[in-house]
Amino acid sequence: MITLKEALKYSKEELENLKKELNEKAKKEKKIGAYIEQFLDKDLSVSGEGVPVAIKDNISVKGWELTSASKILQGYIAPYDASVIVNLKANGFSPFGRCNMDEFAMGSSTASSYYGKTLNPLNFERVPGGSSGGSAAAVAGGLALASLGSDTGGSVRQPAAFCGCVGFKPSYGRVSRYGLASYSSSLDQIGVLTQNVEDAAILYDAIAGYDKMDSTSANIEFIKTAPNLNVNKKLKIAVIENYVNDADSEVKNALLKTIDMLKANGHEIVYKNLLDSKFDIAAYYIIATAEASANLSRYDGVRYGKRSENIQNLKEMYVNTRSEGFGEEVKRRILLGTFVLSSGYYDAYYIKAQKARAFIKAKYEEILQDCDLIFMPVTPTTAFKFDTQKSPMQTYLEDVYTISVNLAGLGGISVPVAKDKEELNISAQLICKAYDEQTLLDGALSLEQMIKH
């Protein structure tokens, strides 16, 4: 598969041929289910001319159906382009194909999609991760040059690690959320999934920057990263020792070898510990579900998507539309979020979670005052099997090493570093200071080239 960098040199005719090839390949590889069009026996959606980039089903593209992989949004056609789509088109890219996802981005396996599950291209018995599993599977399976996803608690980095591609989540506010169907507004961030680190920098440069349409957009200077990539920069990297040691043995051993290679390549390694991850999980799921319960209240049968036909009055319209339209995991999170915001529990849960979030952020900032980057696992294990019986809590633990990065609002990237004995991918995660994506991408490029050579 050609890279984004190479495709940007293509003529208009060559790009049209490339899109035809990708469309045919998507039809042949239908069982992977990376694209929603593969479930519906349709050609891949296309908008504008340029280098094709696949788009997660929660990012608005004018004229395309936007469903967040949910029954409740069936038939909703986006009336405008999200800011990232406007930026993509302005930089020579073309939205091409709707990627499958966990319903409303709630999940770690892309098995909660209304359309059906996406398979991991490395092993069809394994999950591709989530919630941007379709975006990762499309890139890893050679069905897309690159894709856009969203990351609320690891939803770009974790599927990238499971499928074996690069997944990059910029700092909160660096990329506009205008036109992204919200899950948790203070945690959501649009990110990129690519074949390599340089492509991640190129695609990030195309979508990043201040946007007056997004009140949470960071109004600070943005300097393009791809032209300034420096693979030779020597960095001080903090290894989170307790997280590396707690990972599965194969993941741990692969990361320890990677750390030795970083040392051998002239990077300074120091060892630090972060808080017990149980605090991250508790704070994250209280804040994320609280915000989700508010954000998803807009899907009521009046304004968007499908309305239940089994209604006699207004109350039945609300109850039946939401009961029929939302999947089990979404209902679970709405209930949890409503509970933690209720008057008797608001102080006990939500306020405490916000205090814990501030504490987690301060801990990261303390480490990054003295170091350029943080190094730790992306996931505790490699991709698990679809038939693995996991409770909701066990599923939530899949994001144990990624959620705190969102709580702190920092940038993070997942880079493939090894394979396990079953040829499943193992990735390392690098984390930077807020808005220091240049250093993050420099470090990731250095790591990638080190592994390849």
Curated annotation (Swiss-Prot):
Which keywords accompany this UniProt record?
ATP-binding, Ligase, Nucleotide-binding, Protein biosynthesis
Question: What job does the chain carry out?
Answer: Allows the formation of correctly charged Gln-tRNA(Gln) through the transamidation of misacylated Glu-tRNA(Gln) in organisms which lack glutaminyl-tRNA synthetase. The reaction takes place in the presence of glutamine and ATP through an activated gamma-phospho-Glu-tRNA(Gln).
In its UniProt record, a GO molecular function of this protein is: ATP binding
- Spell out the catalytic residues: 56 (charge relay system), 131 (charge relay system), 155 (acyl-ester intermediate)
Indicate the family of this protein. Answer: Belongs to the amidase family. GatA subfamily.
Q: What is the organism of origin for this protein?
A: Campylobacter jejuni subsp. jejuni serotype O:6 (strain 81116 / NCTC 11828)
Q: How does it assemble?
A: Heterotrimer of A, B and C subunits.
BP GO terms, sorted: translation
Provide the coiled-coil residue spans: none
Decide whether keyword Signal is in the record: no
User: Can you supply one Gene Ontology CC term for this chain's record?
Assistant: glutamyl-tRNA(Gln) amidotransferase complex
Identify this protein by name.
Glutamyl-tRNA(Gln) amidotransferase subunit A
The highest taxon in the source lineage is Bacteria
